[in-house]
Amino acid sequence: MTVASMLSSNSMNVGVSNPKMSSKTSACCLLNRPWPSSCSMSISSCGQFGVSEKSKLLCGAGALQVESAPLFSVGQKFQLDDVIEAQQFDRETLSAIFEVARSMENIRGNSSGSQMLKGYLMATLFYEPSTRTRLSFESAMKRLGGDVLTTENAREFSSAAKGETLEDTIRTVEGYSDIIVLRHFESGAARRAAATANIPVINAGDGPGQHPSQALLDVYTIEREIGKLDGIKVGLVGDLANGRTVRSLAYLLAKYRDVKLYFVSPNVVKMKDDIKEYLTSKGVEWEESSDLMEVASKCDVVYQTRIQKERFGEKLNLYEEARGKYIVNQDVLKVMQNHAVVMHPLPKLDEIEADVDNDPRAAYFRQAKNGLYIRMALLKVLLLGW
């Protein structure tokens, strides 16, 4: 049975709960409807099922509890508790997530949407500005029948402004919701939140650290646009030191065979050594270059990013030095291959000239749209399982 067929079948939903909470091994089979969050049962000794520590068994009226019931024949890779960093995914899990995302495109095309997450609440805690990530997560939740508790600027308009710790905020918010989507200005904040929470946490960007859901939609987009992931050549351009999207993308692309990455950036924002060392350890070929035209002529994907002014603090002279050095324009398009695409995590400023938008190889708005499907898939898998 494929993941998509599991998703489309309404005959049975199976999940498991935190094994720390009980010595009882149980399973919950709920017929013909998704689980509400009204009841939680616990199981332990679940290694045989590939059950991870925070997986939940959510069930409601009409649920049947059985002892030692077999679950889906899936491995540890399919148990998803949190989405914190790109390294946590293996290739099989990526393929499974993409399969669910494709099924979500059909739901998106249905004007009535879906009610599979009816009764679930998602809390968005955003300590940094966001348009696409926050709105796409909120849209994803609502299109699946769930509801949203939102904070647009938690750094200024929440108890964080009064000095409350992130951990205390998470402990409070998890009492109001079933899943937390967190964007924070500190690298590592999402990992701290996940260690604190007993509900799923999704990292929507932690400072210059990572942005795993963006990387998932990026790889999903590359596969849809280019038709393959093995053997691709990708040029990462712009702010590679502060851009969390390129870090997460590099980690994910390392899962595929015969990939080559090119790093094109001003000297002050070069790719950090930890990424280079990781790629080398995985046998991924990478090369630094100062010639965008040459790299663009070789690549399947030119992944442009903005220079992140907010990360420079008072060193604005360095920002001005970096800004405008590498711009995707008509000259770059002329040397690109016909099948190649330009991608960008957005927002874009002047690093892509406006007339590039009209070229069919400009994939960044299609890329943003794919974010909805990936985030719908993540919410479904984290809250209901496969």
UniProtKB/Swiss-Prot annotation:
Residue span of the annotated presequence: 1-39
Top enzyme class: transferase
Binding locations of carbamoyl phosphate: 132-133, 183, 211, 214, 346-347
Cellular compartments annotated: Plastid, Chloroplast
GO MF, any single term: amino acid binding
Disulfide bonds: none
Reaction catalysis annotation: carbamoyl phosphate + L-aspartate = N-carbamoyl-L-aspartate + phosphate + H(+)
Keywords annotated in UniProt: Allosteric enzyme, Chloroplast, Plastid, Pyrimidine biosynthesis, Transferase, Transit peptide
Name of this protein: Aspartate carbamoyltransferase 1, chloroplastic
Protein's organism: Pisum sativum
